[in-house]
Amino acid sequence: MVSMHTRRRFLAGLSLAGAAGRVRAPPALAADGALETTTVRIAKIGAICLAPQYVSEELLRAEGFTEIRYVELKDPAAIGQSIGRGEADFSTAFAVDPIQAIDAGAPIVVLAGVHVGCYELVAQPGIHRITELKGKKVAADSPLLLTLMAAQVGLDPANDIHWVTGTDSSFNPLELFADGKIDAFLGFPPNPQELRARHLGQVIVSMAVDRPWSQYFCCMLMGSREYVRNHPVATKRAMRAILKATDLCASEPARVARTIVDRRFTDSYDNALQTLSDVPYDKWREYDAEDTVRFYALRLHDADLIKSTPQKIIAESTDWRFLNELKRELKA
C-alpha cells in the first residue's frame, strides 16, 4: 500500500509540474541534443530561500533526468568548496560563497543569479542603523556579509564590532537575540521570519529593499566545473528546471511552501510561506549576474579577503552561455 506521505508527495509533484507547464511553455528538448548523463546531484541545506532547487525534481524528470539525488553537504557553510570536492553537481548559495571558493581554487563555475535579498539585519530596540552597531555584540549567519555591510558605512569590522561566534551545534544566535544577549543578528531564512513571528527586534537592513544590496543577486547558481564541461546539455536542462522552479516560487508561493514542508526540507509552513513571499524570485531575467559577481568580488578584494581580482574570477570561473539561452527561451 502506498503511504499517505508518498501519495501526497506524488500528487504535489504532479501539481507542481502542471503549474510549471502553465507558467512557461515546454521547451523543444530535441534542440538541446541528447543528455550526456541522466544523473544530477543537488545540494540540500537548511536554507528555505533555496526552495527552487528543492521543488525542481519533477521538472528535472521532465528534462530527462532519471536519477535525481539531494545531497546533505558535509559543510553547508561552504557550499562552493563542497561542490568543488565533488559532493554535489549544483547548488544555489549566497554570492560570496562561490567567489571565496573560486579564490581558494575550487573547480566550480557560477552559472546564473537566482534571487535577490534573503538576508536581514535585525537589531534590538533603539538601534536604527549599521553605524550604531559600533561597540555592540553581534552574531551573523554570514559574518562576511556583515563585514562588508559594516565596511560600507565606514566601520572597522574587526575592531568596532564585538563578534559573538560559536562552532558547535548548540550555538544559536537567534535565541541569543531573543534573550537579549546580543544586540543584532544578521540572518537568512527562516531566522528573520521566525523573529518577525515572535515580534522580536526590528529590521535595520533588508537585502530585498535596501541599496546597494537590493540591486544585486543574493544567491547564485553554481555547478561543478567537471560536470558543466563534460555535460553541457545536462547542465542547460538542469538550469532550465531550476529557473522554472524559481518562477513557481514567485507565482505560487503557497504551493511551493506546502511542497517543501511535505518533502521535509523544512518544518514550518508559515515560515516557508513568509520566506517565499519576502524573497524576490522574479529578478533572474532582469538583473545582471556578472554585475553581482563583480560587485562582491571587488569588495572582497578591496578588504583583502580574496586575492583574485574580479576580472580574473569572471573570466575564468563564470559561464553565462546557458543563462543567456534560457532567458531567450523562458521569456516572461
PLM regions: where:
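N-terminal secretory signal peptides and thylakoid transit peptides that target proteins
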Residues: 2-18
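Conserved C-terminal helix/tail region of periplasmic/extracytoplasmic solute-binding proteins
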Residues: 301-332
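Bilobed "Venus flytrap"/periplasmic-binding protein-like clamshell domains
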Residues: 37-59, 120-121, 130-197, 290, ...
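C-terminal segment of N-terminal export signals and the immediately downstream linker at the start
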Residues: 24-42
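Pocket-lining segment of extracytoplasmic ligand-binding domains
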Residues: 96, 171-262
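Short beta-strand-to-loop elements that line the ligand-binding cleft
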Residues: 67-75, 92, 157-169
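Secondary-structure end/capping motifs
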Residues: 229-308
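Short, polar/charged alpha-helical segment
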Residues: 46-73, 77-78, 82-84, 99-104, ...
